[in-house]
């Protein structure tokens, strides 16, 4: 690869996170000749013994258009399959971006002897379960390292969401960085609309805007049909098509000393805003 061109690995906790947060940036990176891959980590189905908790039922009912008391284990696997299909359709709008989906289950599906770690929304946006920290996170880190034995990638991890899956991956990104991997972070949309603090020393935020890609980003987001109600409320498709709801801004966190990353990312937007 040309020394001026780089390979980027974007880490998406769930099927929609990178498209919502980074789609325009991905497209401009590809346009400039860089290589981009998206690795969706929590794309697996729950185990057959899993008994859905309150939050799993709530989300599945909302996504599938059912009542909560109708939700059974099979519905969860149906939902995961549908979300995977939506993700594949979304990335057809971004030709050239490589995509890989891992089989680690979403937080709301993780369990011990059939019982969920995270039963409520408060649990889901709280502190990661000790078993996730001690057992699950090291497995994720080991897999991520196996993807880059030649250390050719610049890794782009989620930064600011309080969702336990995002928190685990933020920690994984910091650990990879401590081992010498080049790492930067992105603020997850729509979470950054309420909270946008990356509590690490030596990092600065870069805001990118590139309106030329907005129509394609909008079309890609619209493919995530099961998620639109939960993300954007009633008449979400109309709001998106009318130019509302989505943000043109895409936010990244880059180490102050990473001159290569700053050079590449400042070139991606007509007027990048450093804060």
Curated annotation (Swiss-Prot):
Pathway: Antibiotic biosynthesis; butirosin biosynthesis. Zn(2+) binds at residues 14, 17, 166. Its cofactor is Zn(2+). Its EC number is 3.5.1.112. Keywords: Antibiotic biosynthesis, Hydrolase, Metal-binding, Zinc. The keyword Transport does not apply. GO terms for molecular function: hydrolase activity, acting on carbon-nitrogen (but not peptide) bonds, in linear amides; metal ion binding. It catalyses: 2'-N-acetylparomamine + H2O = paromamine + acetate. Binds 1 zinc ion per subunit. InterPro entries: GlcNAc_PI_deacetylase-related, LmbE-like_dom_sf. GO terms for biological process: antibiotic biosynthetic process. Belongs to the PIGL family. Deacetylase involved in the biosynthesis of butirosin by mediating deacetylation of 2'-N-acetylparomamine. This is 2'-N-acetylparomamine deacetylase. It comes from Niallia circulans.
